[in-house]
């Protein structure tokens, strides 16, 4: 991003999707026994993460896990002092797409 005095931001493609195109998290679903967290976006895409990827979420009770707040930029768990960003989720998706073997 541009930090010059003119306050105009230069967004990278991920920032553009979030701040200009309005991409956001709509809902989060958990299945602790299966170690799955599903993140539903407003463009109808679903992101999947392992709960165990984050130590605080992995050790959370069901009540703590379900006590979260969705903001414009991510998810916050006040009981756990844990924050996961939409930007981080999208970056992980890009890495997964690049590293996955092509299917023909």
Label for each model-derived stretch:
Residues 1-104:
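Motif-centric detector for short Cys/His coordination patterns
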């Amino acid at each position: 991003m541009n930090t010059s005095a003119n306050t105009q931001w230069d967004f990278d493609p991920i920032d553009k999707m979030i701040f200009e195109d309005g991409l956001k998290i709509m809902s989060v679903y958990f299945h602790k026994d299966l170690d799955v967290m599903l993140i539903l976006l407003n463009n109808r895409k679903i992101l999947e993460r392992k709960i165990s990827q984050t130590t605080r979420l992995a050790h959370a009770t069901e009540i703590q896990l379900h006590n979260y707040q969705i903001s414009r930029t991510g998810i916050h768990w006040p009981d756990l002092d844990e924050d996961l960003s939409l930007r981080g989720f999208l970056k992980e998706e890009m890495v997964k797409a690049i590293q996955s073997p092509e299917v023909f």
